[in-house]
Amino acid sequence: MTLAKRIIPCLDVTAGRVVKGVNFLELRDAGDPIEIARRYDEQGADEITFLDITATSDGRDLILDIIEAVASQVFIPLTVGGGVRAVDDVRRLLNAGADKVGINSSAISNPQLVFDASQKYGSQCIVVAIDAKKASDGRWEVFTHGGRKATGLDAVEWAKKMQNLGAGEILLTSMDRDGTKIGFDLDLTRSVSDAISIPVIASGGVGGLQDLADGVKVGRADAVLAASIFHYGQHTVQEAKRFMADQGIPMRLV
């Protein structure tokens, strides 16, 4: 049986509000995280991803209070990332109600964290987020700290390493496409999807429903993540699911 592909609305959170930017900059307020999460749950989203986008660069603590509030009202899986620096942070987020924990900058500075966390809590709980930008040599380079810090690492090779260390899923964001609404970087998505066996979530650049379908059909992603098209009422999750199902993509329709 073919696994259904997933639609995952993404809530970028800073200072307790949901925001959306372009190329990781120019942030615009999109609303209250608890209200928005509840709306997506009602619309039939498969999961919700929360990213505290300035926790690492600001050195702030985890957004446990928001996660507890959302988890008490939302009954689909929650992935939470931002500011995860230690195995104990993973524990605290899971205890607050997260189903999966995203690790990004800390996976670079301390790859052992991915191994230790997946050993303790299971690979199914650990999502490694990779923010990648096209380099002049044609590769994709990994960036950290909300896209502000270049690492010199090749995104495809890094995804392989993270799989080997125990990541259960890769959340792959094209920084070049983030917020641009011109579609996923399908070459990047396909290159990573073909290189690893764990699920890849495509992120960055969705401007319409065809972009979501292309992420799966062309990019070979297992799930597609979007923010702007859902936050500002351009489309609902149900519309997106019906559109993808009409193109022959297996979806969980509610």
Curated annotation (Swiss-Prot):
GO terms for biological process: L-histidine biosynthetic process. Pfam families: His_biosynth. Pathway: Amino-acid biosynthesis; L-histidine biosynthesis; L-histidine from 5-phospho-alpha-D-ribose 1-diphosphate: step 5/9. Its EC number is 4.3.2.10. It catalyses: 5-[(5-phospho-1-deoxy-D-ribulos-1-ylimino)methylamino]-1-(5-phospho-beta-D-ribosyl)imidazole-4-carboxamide + L-glutamine = D-erythro-1-(imidazol-4-yl)glycerol 3-phosphate + 5-amino-1-(5-phospho-beta-D-ribosyl)imidazole-4-carboxamide + L-glutamate + H(+). Keywords: Amino-acid biosynthesis, Cytoplasm, Histidine biosynthesis, Lyase. GO terms for molecular function: imidazoleglycerol-phosphate synthase activity; lyase activity. It is found in: Cytoplasm. One of its GO terms (cellular component) is cytoplasm. InterPro entries: Aldolase_TIM (IPR013785), His_biosynth (IPR006062), HisF (IPR004651), IGPS_HisA/HisF (IPR050064), RibuloseP-bd_barrel (IPR011060). The active site is at 12, 131. CDD domains: HisF (cd04731). Heterodimer of HisH and HisF. Belongs to the HisA/HisF family. IGPS catalyzes the conversion of PRFAR and glutamine to IGP, AICAR and glutamate. The HisF subunit catalyzes the cyclization activity that produces IGP and AICAR from PRFAR using the ammonia provided by the HisH subunit. NCBIfam families: hisF. This is Imidazole glycerol phosphate synthase subunit HisF. It comes from Janthinobacterium sp. (strain Marseille) (Minibacterium massiliensis). The lineage of its organism: Bacteria, Pseudomonadati, Pseudomonadota, Betaproteobacteria, Burkholderiales. The gene is hisF.
